[in-house]
Design a protein with these regions (language model features):
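Hydrophobic membrane-insertion alpha-helices, especially the h-region
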Residues: 37-51
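A structural signal for short, hydrophobic/glycine-enriched beta-strand patches
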Residues: 51-224
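Hydrophobic alpha-helical segments of integral membrane proteins
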Residues: 3-8, 53, 57-61, 238-245
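Membrane-embedded alpha-helical segments of integral membrane proteins
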Residues: 1-27
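Structural signal for membrane-spanning alpha-helices in multi-pass inner-membrane proteins
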Residues: 25-26, 49, 247
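Membrane-interface helix-boundary motifs at transmembrane edges
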Residues: 28-36
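Alpha-helical transmembrane anchor segments
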Residues: 12-18, 203, 231, 248
Length: 252
């Protein structure tokens, strides 16, 4: 009964409700010149909103780099944590401005790495608009509240995208004479991040986190049920592949 209710909810919430609306429209528009467009739109939305498609697409990015064991990480001087957006002005435990879900997972991973390796942490992330708080400042406040000493934290608060993350972190990399750093970001984002950091001449060890997929794809009813999460994950993956193309073509 519980499974049946969850499946019902999935079809009554977006995007499922939109697909049902298209089916109803198709019933009224059969044998008209617009019939094939409804079929095409339905198929496109459906395929982009089911887990069996989204998991395969985003997993192709997440599997690009393995997460290394801490015991094999050697000869590194710092770690770089890339921001992933923030909720500007949102009330937080000890201030205002809150990290997004992905940014919080990245910080949680970096915090555990810091406790294991005692490395300086470069927090990279600025603000898109002048009246917003920089991501690095919000991350700094979070890590200080978690007990990380100020001497371990380096803020890079000018970057607005991944290309600028790499550009401005390079200045810190050179200023502190780093030779190798750990790069912490979401697994789906890691291929593009590594490409941009390597283009700037930095030696990085990828440490992916914030995985969006299970280790093994589960083929059950939910894998073929429309979900807004799957639409979002597909958009993330497509954005990353377009970004990789832009890097390769020199557009970014």
């Amino acid at each position: 009964m519980l499974v049946a209710l969850k499946l019902l909810y999935a079809w009554l919430l977006p995007p499922g409700i939109f697909l049902l609306a298209l089916l109803v429209a198709y019933c009224f528009c059969r044998k008209t010149k617009n019939e094939h467009w409804l079929v095409l739109i339905f198929a496109l939305i459906y395929l982009l909103s089911i887990r069996v498609v989204s998991d395969r697409l985003i997993k192709s990015l997440e599997d690009w780099y393995d997460q290394p064991a801490v015991s094999v990480i050697k000869d590194v001087q710092a770690m770089v944590i890339l921001g992933s957006g923030s909720y500007d002005g949102a009330p937080d435990f000890d201030g205002v401005g809150q990290n997004t879900e992905s940014a919080t997972v990245r910080l949680g991973t970096a915090l555990r790495l810091h406790r294991a390796l005692h490395l300086p942490m470069v927090l990279s992330g600025g603000n898109l608009f002048d009246d917003m708080d920089a991501e690095a400042g919000i991350e700094y406040r979070f890590l200080r509240a978690c007990g990380v000493e100020d001497r371990y934290l380096i803020k890079e608060d000018r970057s607005r995208n991944t290309a600028e993350n790499a550009k401005y972190v390079k200045q810190i990399y050179q200023q502190h004479h780093f030779k190798k750093v750990i790069l912490v970001t979401s697994a789906f984002h890691m291929p593009r991040a590594v490409a941009l950091f390597q283009r700037e001449g930095m030696n990085v060890i990828p440490y992916p986190t914030d995985y969006k997929t299970d280790k093994k794809l589960r083929l059950n009813a939910f894998a073929f049920t429309p979900s807004s999460d799957c639409l979002y994950h597909n958009s993330l993956a497509m954005k990353e592949y377009l970004g990789l193309l832009a890097v390769k073509m020199g557009w970014q």
